[in-house]
Amino acid sequence: MARIFQPKKKTQLNTRHQAVQVERLDHHGAGIAYLKKKPLFIDGALPGEEVVTQLVEEKSKFARGKLIKILKPSEARVEPFCSHYHECGGCDLQHLNYDQQLTHKQQTLRQLMRKFAGSDIELGAPVLGESLGYRRRARVSLFVDKKTRQLHFGFRKKQSKQIAQVTDCPVLAPELNVLLPEIYSTLKAFKKPEQLGHVELVLGDNAPCITLRHLNKLTEKETNTLVELAKRHQASLYLMPETDQLDLVEGEVPFYQEAGVTVPFTPNNFIQVNQAVNQKMVAQAVDWLDPKSDERVLDLFCGLGNFSLPIAKRAKHVVGVEGVAEMVEKAVNNASLNQINNARFYHANLEQDFEGQVWAAEQFDKVLLDPARAGASGIIDQVSVLGARRIVYVSCNPATLARDSQSLLEQGYQLTKLGMLDMFPHTSHLESMALFEKS
């Protein structure tokens, strides 16, 4: 007999306002209260606060609420310094004083390592830079309202594809922030602003850099207007008519310097957002790795050579491996530019088994890993076959660091140092660094 499908009746969401006590923050900076013994996540709420919330989502194991009113504020609560904070999705912790932000991030890192890697270790001092004006790159979103023909210019709203109108960003480097209102006024005068994609801003040591992604060819007048804007600010200007095409039409190729090396890049290359923290991060990684003049070092996920090139100044030989072919080519060029002759670079897929790769047949004294947020799960189980006695793991996701750490511990390594790097102040995002050693 055929069964007749009957859709499950949806439970009516109770949207009435409810007062709750916030107990702690989750790893993403949301306040956690409990409603009927179920965790209730409330963005913008802080531990110790009594707040009024309205349910916006309810699942079998958790619920989410919207912050309506704060009945009893936390002593750690501060007034956000940005007028766009409650709308823009760029920052999510401006309402928490900076010292408490650091404490929260350190606790998050330690808790994740304890829970998933089974390792409880005291953290070293956090690596810090300036908490404002620190971003040396940002992508500005563009959208034209079909009805009003108004150009929206700014950053994505919180948990939305809509754009918050922003022409002033306190966490953006001043050299880039000053460009925002002028770029906006220039672009909104274009004949067909709906044919514009986005604006990429990046600050090199030599100059700020503006990149405009556009779908149709710009008029000569529009191009000249952008060139004049760039000249006024002594900026480089790239036009990007295709996803993989970059045309430098004004200024010079940007570069940054660190640890005695010069690293040229283009706007579509990955570089760390926070220059000051990046410099300290590289210095700490080299210090923890402690490469000797007779040692061979492997740098996995090497990018442009952010770590490889400074390490090569001290090691006998460095091998860098990267999954993006263009980055490998530029790493080779960067080594040549800096007259570094003891570094080789390879293109390889580091999301899968590296057995059979030429570089993997070699033995290394030390290894550095700097993977993307997904971590290094594709190769982490093989690291011990490389023979390294010391491994430095630089992570932009503490959850995947904790997961990969478990594998390294099972391979006989010991976690001897752990630290947090505040690459993104006023956000819940945290970077970390771990040192593993094998006797």
From Swiss-Prot:
One of its GO terms (molecular function) is rRNA (uridine-C5-)-methyltransferase activity. Residues 10-69 form the TRAM domain. The keyword Glycosyltransferase does not apply. Its EC number is 2.1.1.190. SUPFAM superfamilies: Nucleic acid-binding proteins, S-adenosyl-L-methionine-dependent methyltransferases. The active site is at C396. It catalyses: uridine(1939) in 23S rRNA + S-adenosyl-L-methionine = 5-methyluridine(1939) in 23S rRNA + S-adenosyl-L-homocysteine + H(+). It is an enzyme of class 2 (transferase). S-adenosyl-L-methionine binds at Q272, F301, N306, E322, N349, D370. Keywords: 4Fe-4S, Iron, Iron-sulfur, Metal-binding, Methyltransferase, rRNA processing, S-adenosyl-L-methionine, Transferase. [4Fe-4S] cluster binds at C82, C88, C91, C169. Gene3D superfamilies: 2.40.50.1070, Nucleic acid-binding proteins (2.40.50.140), Vaccinia Virus protein VP39 (3.40.50.150). One of its GO terms (biological process) is rRNA base methylation. Belongs to the class I-like SAM-binding methyltransferase superfamily. RNA M5U methyltransferase family. RlmD subfamily. Catalyzes the formation of 5-methyl-uridine at position 1939 (m5U1939) in 23S rRNA. This is 23S rRNA (uracil(1939)-C(5))-methyltransferase RlmD. It comes from Vibrio campbellii (strain ATCC BAA-1116).
